[in-house]
Amino acid sequence: MSERMTPRLFPVSLLIGLLAGCATTPPPDVRRDARLDPQVGAAGATQTTAEQRADGNASAKPTPVIRRGSGTMINQSAAAAPSPTLGMASSGSATFNFEGESVQAVVKAILGDMLGQNYVIAPGVQGTVTLATPNPVSPAQALNLLEMVLGWNNARMVFSGGRYNIVPADQALAGTVAPSTASPSAARGFEVRVVPLKYISASEMKKVLEPYARPNAIVGTDASRNVITLGGTRAELENYLRTVQIFDVDWLSGMSVGVFPIQSGKAEKISADLEKVFGEQSKTPSAGMFRFMPLENANAVLVITPQPRYLDQIQQWLDRIDSAGGGVRLFSYELKYIKAKDLADRLSEVFGGRGNGGNSGPSLVPGGVVNMLGNNSGGADRDESLGSSSGATGGDIGGTSNGSSQSGTSGSFGGSSGSGMLQLPPSTNQNGSVTLEVEGDKVGVSAVAETNTLLVRTSAQAWKSIRDVIEKLDVMPMQVHIEAQIAEVTLTGRLQYGVNWYFENAVTTPSNADGSGGPNLPSAAGRGIWGDVSGSVTSNGVAWTFLGKNAAAIISALDQVTNLRLLQTPSVFVRNNAEATLNVGSRIPINSTSINTGLGSDSSFSSVQYIDTGVILKVRPRVTKDGMVFLDIVQEVSTPGARPAACTAAATTTVNSAACNVDINTRRVKTEAAVQNGDTIMLAGLIDDSTTDGSNGIPFLSKLPVVGALFGRKTQNSDRREVIVLITPSIVRNPQDARDLTDEYGSKFKSMRPMDVHK
């Protein structure tokens, strides 16, 4: 059964293999924070000035919040509209002349004789009327005149049941009228209108209408529905509704509101003082133009006024009152970049004073360490940049302390301890306090490491001066992306005098007119070979190019004329004015101290130090505003020699003695350089010249005196190697620059596709 399936499975297996061979590795997915997207294109890549960063921190200090209103408290268009009319008097057809007539006679003349309407007069309606209309009046005007004279006599005309009922004013509502939302022009006698309000409350509208309305004209208010009910004749209702339209406006949009934080003193007390001067009870022209409310939780004063420009004047008064306050308060400032303890020390240097507590030492960011680059003090490199050696005093970076260590622990970043572990420095107390002298006053400043916050107890005036200094110091430091290529070049042929000599002297002008070919390379002496210089090597026909921003071209050019071996190609980010250490090699134990107490056979004690060997590069960049990068560089290539033969014995006393220490062949350069952003500098001249003697020949015969040379020969090989260092610093001013570098490396990884073996 299996033999029959085998031919069928073979094509399937072959197809799967072909598909797997054609598959490619998907490109890496780089995820980013969308908040890092540039908002203004290329402007996002520019360096932020100290002034701009200070403005960005302005939100940290309490600033007034002002909303300026329109200043419009009434409906201007409604107030300017003309009053409604009933038509011209010339359109009328009747004239009246009443001299002390009774109300009943006037009602009969207008309603009965002129308009022909049914009417009923209640017994309680009494009064006399004097009325004359030399010009003819219309029926609508006559009805309006009747409503007016009835109102003067405390009577109302209510249309109900197809007739007009003339009743006393206090009986006009009960059981005779119902609320309506119709237009006042449709009113026939005394009616009631329900008016919904948009912005103003019903109770406030009642206060506004009371001076203009007849007694009992405001029937009622409903706060839950925010409506007001009005009663009156057509003319009265038109006036009432027009008044409502004038005052029912967006009051909040017209009012100006300001919230002013108080630095010294209490908001409640300051608000009460302002109320006495500008409030409703004050005897000033601006009385009632302001409303002051203390906000105790925020220690601020809320100011409301219908005039926007008044807020500026109130702010000036508040600033004067706040500045004049001599009270001492506790201020806090949460720092973003610099350590609180270090900033407290800087403030002590600026304003003068003294401090106590915590550990001193400058640092640009929380957790950062500032050290010094230096040479050895005892011939060995001991890196104390991160951590310290037990029992030893800390030395400079690139230097060695003279102390000893039983454990052999080193604090080198990227290195290892004697037990093979990288150790962080112990957590130290970074809290501290200083006392400043600001404008003759003592100011207490406390640094809280847990929240990286400064606590300052002082007056508001002194706090302003201290805060200005804090905002200038608490800025984001720039970073530098350093690409280095460390190579070892074999000095043979044209390179026998060194790499630098080769570029300066062995490169001459080409013979061809077009600048290509010729027996020699184009001259680079005096031209700055790190600019755009190109030519060709005629010995093997390989072209080469030097570019100021392309260190790989230099490596490629040297690789064509000699043997070249890359020792290290690190790429690292480092903060401005901080140190980057790269170490690839071995740690060699060195017996520094041996003590024999003489108290028995096993009474010898030794102290061992571990020395870093291999390729060690230490760089500290310092960036200027114009894009120049100053570099402090220490480069070392060290190789341990062979251990003495006597140390291979089993004797413990011999192996552990200082005589068993190996020699370390070291090539080191320490320099300071200045380079433009993105350009490459080369360090050369670390030449190692070694000679190896050897002999071979016929055994025994080649060792005979005098004639032994006839049966053998002696050899002597000279080996010259030079270490060159190419360093390219690139300034990273903001997160967008860091993203661009990530994209560049990501594109390089994407281009590394698997090889297609089927082609």
From Swiss-Prot:
Residue span of region Disordered = 40-69, 352-434
- In residue numbers, the region (N3) covers 326-474
Ranges where the record places region N0 = 92-187
Compositionally skewed regions (Low complexity) per UniProt: 40-51
Extract the ranges annotated as region (Secretin).
479-734
Read off the Pfam families from this record. Secretin, Secretin_N, type_II_gspD_N0
Q: What is its main location?
A: membrane
Q: Where is this site: May serve as a pivot that allows opening of the central gate for substrate egress?
A: G585
Lipid-conjugated positions (S-diacylglycerol cysteine) = C22
The record's Gene Ontology biological-process terms are: protein secretion; protein secretion by the type II secretion system
Q: Which InterPro entries match?
A: Bact_Secretion_Sys_Channel (IPR050810), GspD-like_N0 (IPR049371), GspD/PilQ (IPR001775), NolW-like (IPR005644), NolW-like_sf (IPR038591), T2SS/T3SS_dom (IPR004846), T2SS_GspD (IPR013356), T2SS_GspD_CS (IPR004845)
Q: Which family does it belong to?
A: Belongs to the bacterial secretin family. GSP D subfamily.
Protein name (database record):
Secretin XpsD
Q: Please give the organism.
A: Xanthomonas campestris pv. campestris (strain ATCC 33913 / DSM 3586 / NCPPB 528 / LMG 568 / P 25)
The top of its lineage is: Bacteria, Pseudomonadati, Pseudomonadota, Gammaproteobacteria, Lysobacterales
